[in-house]
Amino acid sequence: MRAAGKAWISVVVLVAGIVLLPGLLYLLGLTLVEGRPQPADRVPSGVAACTSEPRTGYQPMNPWHFIARFFDKDVMKKKVPEVEREAFWIARRHLWRQPQQDMLRWHLSSTALTIWITQHWSTAQIADTARKEDFCRAWSKRRVPGGPMRK
């Protein structure tokens, strides 16, 4: 095989690896999680648990969108939607109930589980579960000036 052909094959393999990496990391993160959290058994309200932010028009996260955020300065400046913040809290609470892992695995599995929750639960289920787990109270205590986050 000629050198040019080998170079093109190398480029194609490299690009395919880069394109597939977020999805593979997502699947790896999900395999590190024992079970999946269950949504709360409540009547859906459709309102964010911690704010009055409406839940219409939210697009679920996916691994590629999550990675792309790190390269878009405008997105990095925007506030994270409440539904994603609540999904992260639900994922974190679920992982706290499992045997401890090292930090890299914990971050990978919490990110993967957050993505999974936004894809498989409705925004109302996320809000109701966050309300049931009392995340609003915990979140607001950390935001209060002079609260636990102050050093």
Residue ranges and their predicted role:
Residues R2-K151:
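Juxtamembrane regions of bacterial inner-membrane/periplasmic proteins
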